[in-house]
Regions:
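Short alpha-helical elements
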Residues: 1-297
């Protein structure tokens, strides 16, 4: 589909889901109704993220210039940004509903990983006042990166749809965050070696029905068959692909805001945009993680 078709498709999808959840959240207590509808704002955000418009200014300018005929009431950037931020709960609810209606939330095999989320340059971290006391120093062994900020937890299905994305502290080792990543899930969980903890894995399996499968370290024995380990290693490539999407296409590691509330709002927006892309690919019977091929430029 081309860009026009994509925008219309996203708008129809947003309207369908918004009608279901709009009575759950008290969005505004009084005053005049905004000129731009909530459905239009959500569509602008999702499409803007997909088009790699990382900042509110870029997003507003692009659609004001090229799609004023689609969104004739898009006139004031400040009002648009404020309205978008106030819809953070709606965005989270729509993202959750898409995992439900697509059937992906019940996938018995879901893969976990974490991503570093720096909030500023490492050398500026000592002077940061925006995220104290929430942000902290962390280390990403895979990227050999020391950073100041948070971790983004990821749990995805075999198709690549994100079913859980908790915002986690940066300092603890991944294994200490395992309970947050598998909360509410029962099934098989392929993970990397950073999640190896025999005692914790045994407790999760016996008490909660969560079977965390990790590749063994050198000279480490394992009860898992080579076939299972090979299958889990193949599945882990999916979470690495999703991590690359979020880092490169959706720029989650370059969120430059001044407080935790706006940080979470921007993060939820990017997660929703990724989920919409995977959802549409599934509907069109395309490779779920082929986001580049979804829209022809």
């Amino acid at each position: 589909m081309d860009r026009d078709e994509f925008i219309i498709t996203v708008y129809c999808l947003v309207c369908e889901q918004y009608q279901v959840i709009k009575n759950t959240y008290f969005l505004r207590r009084g005053g005049f109704a905004p000129a731009l509808s909530d459905e239009e704002v959500l569509t602008l955000e999702v499409c803007g993220e997909y088009f790699k418009l990382a900042t509110d200014k870029d997003l507003f300018t692009y659609f004001r210039t090229h799609y004023a005929h689609f969104f004739p009431h898009l006139r004031d950037r400040t009002l648009f940004v404020r309205q978008a931020a106030n819809l953070w709960q709606v965005k989270a609810a729509i993202q959750y509903r898409l995992t439900q209606v697509s059937g992906q939330a019940t996938d018995p095999v879901q893969i976990i990983d974490t991503l570093p989320l720096p909030v500023c340059g490492y050398t500026r971290s000592g002077r940061d006042r925006c995220f104290k006391p929430f942000a902290d120093y962390g280390h990403c062994a895979a990227k050999k990166l020391d950073y100041y900020g948070f971790k983004l937890g990821l749990r995805i299905t075999r198709c690549g749809m994100i079913t859980a994305c908790p915002l986690l502290p940066a300092r603890p080792h991944d294994i200490q965050l395992l309970d947050d990543l598998v909360a509410g899930f029962v099934g098989l969980v392929p993970a990397d070696k950073g999640f190896i903890d025999t005692f914790r894995q045994t407790v999760l399996a016996e008490r909660h029905g969560v079977f965390v499968i990790t590749a063994p370290r050198k000279r480490m024995t394992t009860a898992h068959s080579p076939g299972l380990l090979k299958a889990c290693a193949r599945l882990r490539k999916g979470v690495e692909t999703v991590g690359s999407h979020l880092t490169e296409r959706f720029a989650v590691a370059r969120l430059r805001v001044h407080d935790l509330w706006h940080f979470q709002h921007r993060l939820i927006r990017k997660i929703l945009a990724h989920t919409v892309g995977v959802f549409l690919n599934l509907q069109l019977r395309r490779p779920p993680l082929d986001l580049d091929g979804l829209v022809t430029l």
